[in-house]
Amino acid sequence: MTAFALSLILAAAVIHASWNYLLKRSGGGTVFVWLFAVSSTLIYAPLAAAIIWWQKPDFGWVHYGLMFASATLHTVYYLLLDRGYRSGDLSIVYPIARGSGPLITVLCAVLLLGEHPTALAVAGALLIGGGAIALTGDPRKLRQSGNLHAVGFALLTGCMIAGYTLVDKIAVAAWLIPPLVQDWATNLGRVVLMTPSALTRRDEIGPTWQRAKRSIVAIAVLCPLSYILVLTAMVFTPVSYVAPAREISILVAALMGTHLLAEGDAPRRLAAAAAMVGGIVCLALG
């Protein structure tokens, strides 16, 4: 992995953990997710239009199909992630979701894209899996405060991460969709898919905006930015390297969960997160 790709991924990781912290702190909800999707689409529309005007890409049905598939997977991802945060702690949900995603992604990259991880990469995958298990601690504790349900949502979120990562890799690397345009189209599709559900809760839209408009706008800026950086790295870097390396955000989220959100058992959680980061480093170097 080049230094430029690694710098993009590290910057994206910090930004990604930051907007997840804001989502957890805000309380979330379907209307909240819809509002920041709408805001993201509006904020990044001028940049997307400028890139399309400048590059004049020749989009066909395959390009639009990849955009729609990514939008669908991202929509399910955000809804599952939000449900997980409302069920359990940030420092449980975030690392398990982000830790399981790369494992599934690497497996699919081997089976579907013909990538071949080394022994060091396999060791990294095992560290990530072990760290995710250690993070949950005593299985009996998972039944407290909804954490068992939160782990389920986190694992489903990991499946969605693998799905949209592979789709977006194909979109930006094989079909040459500009990264910002791919992300913007995904956000637009998410707005379209979520609007019917949001309208059934129209009485919540105004109060949710008034209660959390600063968090909504911040997430609307940070969420696309973090993924645009990742998509840019994926243009010239194998996905089996990018997907695991970006999970350095796990450690950042664990720090936020234990220190900013006062979630307990900091030593165990941070040690488990550190093991997962070690696994990510092995995957990146392998």
Q: Residue spans of the language-model regions?
A:
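Membrane-interface interhelical linkers
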Residues: 1-69, 76-88, 137-155, 185-221, ...
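Hydrophobic transmembrane alpha-helices of multi-pass small-molecule transport proteins
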Residues: 44, 106-110, 119-139, 268-285
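Helix-loop junctions at the membrane-solvent interface of multi-pass transporters
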Residues: 49-54, 111-112, 134-138, 175, ...
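Specific alpha-helical transmembrane segments that line the substrate/conduction pathway
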Residues: 69-74, 85-132, 181-189, 239-259
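Selected transmembrane alpha-helices and immediately adjacent juxtamembrane segments
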Residues: 148-181
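C-terminal structured domain segments across diverse proteins
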Residues: 216, 236-243, 257-286
